[in-house]
């Protein structure tokens, strides 16, 4: 029962991580306008994401435009686009693999050893996905902070950390936690199986020992008669 609860908790974390990965990939709030020094133009707000940039003026609806070319992106955003797409695919693959290894799933049979190995595979993929999400989010955040404190960068070009980065860090931790729980499920299953097989063998050894101990006395009585 405890193992099944761990499976469900890990699956929920994996599902949340998968949704978060897709959300971070499509969100435009990776870089947002920084209102500092002479750039205190609060009626204009700019967002920059992996696929589009958005601008909102005072009393005007937010307007977004898809990038015309991949080369229009900075190197960190170009790499982040590829890594986040790969992370989305990995998260979906890990989630579907985890469903196949769940205790309530019947299409993969009832063998606990097979299912535990499937869950271990899903856990490893979830863990790798968390690292893949963590790399681009931290990379972009580092470039934003570096440019923010660089005196050679114009104030109008400086940006702040957007909401997508914070969600990305949270998503990476959730994915890693889900993968760790699936690995714990595998360890618990292997431990219970080893205990289950070790107890009968121990009892069999005791029985054979008692049988050997009784046999000489029986033989001696028959020989005496």
Swiss-Prot record:
Disruption-associated phenotype: Conditional knockout mice lacking Cldn8 in the collecting duct of kidney show hypotension, hypokalemia, and metabolic alkalosis.
Tissue: Expressed primarily in lung and kidney. Present in both cortical and medullar collecting ducts (at protein level).
Modification after translation, per record: Ubiquitinated by the BCR(KLHL3) E3 ubiquitin ligase complex in the kidney, leading to its degradation.
Keyword Transmembrane helix: yes
GO cellular component terms listed in the entry, alphabetical order: apicolateral plasma membrane; basolateral plasma membrane; bicellular tight junction; membrane
Short name of one Pfam family: PMP22_Claudin
Name of the featured protein: Claudin-8
Species name: Mus musculus
């Amino acid at each position: 029962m405890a193992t099944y609860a761990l499976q469900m908790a890990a699956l929920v974390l994996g599902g949340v991580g998968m949704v978060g990965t897709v959300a971070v990939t499509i969100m435009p709030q990776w870089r947002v306008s920084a209102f500092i020094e002479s750039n205190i133009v609060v009626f204009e707000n700019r967002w920059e994401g992996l696929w589009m940039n958005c601008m909102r003026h005072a009393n005007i609806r937010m307007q977004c435009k898809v990038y015309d070319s991949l080369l229009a992106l900075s190197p960190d955003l170009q790499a982040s686009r590829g890594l986040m797409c790969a992370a989305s695919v990995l998260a979906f693959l890990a989630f579907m693999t985890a469903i196949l290894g769940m205790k309530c799933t019947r299409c993969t049979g009832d063998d606990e050893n097979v299912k535990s190995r499937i869950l271990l595979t899903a856990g490893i993929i979830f863990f790798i996905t968390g690292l893949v999400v963590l790399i681009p989010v931290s990379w972009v955040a580092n470039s934003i902070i570096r440019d923010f404190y660089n005196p050679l960068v114009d104030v109008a070009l400086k940006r702040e950390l957007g909401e997508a980065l914070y969600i990305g860090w949270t998503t990476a931790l959730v994915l890693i936690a889900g993968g760790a729980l699936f690995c714990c499920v595998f360890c618990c299953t292997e431990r219970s199986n080893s205990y289950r097989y070790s107890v009968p063998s121990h009892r069999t050894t005791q029985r054979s020992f008692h049988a050997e101990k009784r046999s000489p006395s029986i033989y001696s009585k028959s020989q005496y008669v």
